[in-house]
Amino acid sequence: MKSATFDSWGVGLRAKHFQDWHAASSIPMLEIMADNLIHHEGGPALWHTTRIAERAAAVVLHGVAMNIGGANPLSLNYLAGIQKLIERFKPIVVSDHLCFSQAAGLQSYELLPLIRSRETLEHVIERVDFVQQFLGHQFTLENVSAYVSYKDDSIPEGDFLSEIAHRSGCGILLDVNNVFVTSKNFNLDPLDELKRFDLNAVNQIHVAGHSLKEDFLFDTHDSLVCTDVWDLLRKTLETFEVCNDRRVPVILENDNSEVILSDLLNELEAGKKFCLFGTPGTTSESSGRPSANGN
């Protein structure tokens, strides 16, 4: 695999690392969480993020509250806030999740999977079209992890998201860990499920850690990425190389409040080496479940 594939590796920007980034001699690609800034007209969080982003190799913008699959009208105030962040940070990718998070006037602080039906598909496409016209920027949708299924599901997840991308022109943020978690929870083969996604529509990738909760995997973003997930990413990147030699941004997510930046960057480097050479580095071992140490 050509080393050029790895020009666009990075991590999520978190407030706990602001001072470390200010002191860093160089800054890789960063993912900025839109919802941490969307209501800020000023203040320290916006100031720090702006100064750090100015030195980053590139920036991608990621949100969690678009509610693209919900029945409630899309929030114009929220979209206007995203638009301001686009103007400020000039991100190369603007994304949120293929899910719903509001219903009957109530806000769920979880990313709830959609019923994958033709009706839902048409609903999402219509809303994505509106979002892209409003923002004047391509919108990108991420696959979420799932722990339950619906009796009315009729379209596999990869096919569902790929058709939305084809018909709306939106991108796909392929979360490799979410593919792995969902597949294992439903006794599916992760590589088979990954192959359902149209990789030509993928313009960003996420990789993260997960945890074991009794008899299922849970997407927690609080541990090392296991070897099985890195291996799934390696196979994904190999497919990109065969298809069109594109450089797709890969973002390592970790929301553990205790993780220090140097450890996070070391894990990112270990993941690169694993994908290049099959060398595990500091990744945790897994055969479909997290290792005994909780990672």
Residue ranges and their predicted role:
Residues 1-20:
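Boundary/entry segment of secreted carbohydrate-active catalytic domains
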Residues 258-281:
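C-terminal helical cap(s) of enzyme catalytic domains, especially alpha/beta-barrels
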Residues 30, 94, 175, 205, ...:
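Conserved, mostly hydrophobic/aromatic
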